[in-house]
UniProtKB/Swiss-Prot annotation:
It is a multi-pass membrane protein. Keywords: Cell inner membrane, Cell membrane, Electron transport, Heme, Iron, Membrane, Metal-binding, Transmembrane, Transmembrane helix, Transport, Tricarboxylic acid cycle. It is found in: Cell inner membrane. GO terms for molecular function: electron transfer activity; metal ion binding. This is Succinate dehydrogenase cytochrome b556 subunit. Pathway: Carbohydrate metabolism; tricarboxylic acid cycle.
């Protein structure tokens, strides 16, 4: 490149970096929906395997009652389940063309998070 072309190349605008990007509720929930989908795949696979093992040895059930880490994993799995369910219902409304305004997207997004937390609390209390 000639000197002028290099100067022009260096002065061209670049896209904003992730450090200055402010995440929006819709983008955050979209990423969370994908993460919970992957997490549920693994969690349900492990739970199925665990239930099969508990059929032959009851110590696996006792382990779940006494181990805090397993209980925390089960609570997080139930939150992921409820979040994925509530957000899936939200997507069904989008499929029929409802709730596309910015206000509706933000309102339903926060509603999904609040309902997921409430359903998880109701399940475990």
């Amino acid at each position: 490149m000639t000197k002028t072309k290099q100067e022009i190349y260096n002065k061209r605008p670049t896209s904003p970096h992730l450090t200055i990007y402010k995440p929006q509720i819709s983008s955050t929930l979209s990423i969370l929906h994908r993460m919970t989908g992957v997490a549920l795949f693994f969690a349900v696979s492990i739970l199925a395997w665990w239930f099969i093992l508990s059929k032959f040895d009851s110590n696996y059930i006792k382990l779940a009652n006494c181990c805090c880490i397993i209980k925390i994993c089960l609570i997080l799995t139930s939150f992921a389940w409820f979040y994925h369910l509530c957000n899936g219902i939200r997507h069904l409304f989008w499929d029929i063309g409802l709730g596309f305004s910015i206000k509706a997207v933000n309102l339903t997004g926060w509603s999904v998070v609040i309902c997921s937390v409430l359903f998880t609390i109701l399940l475990w209390v």
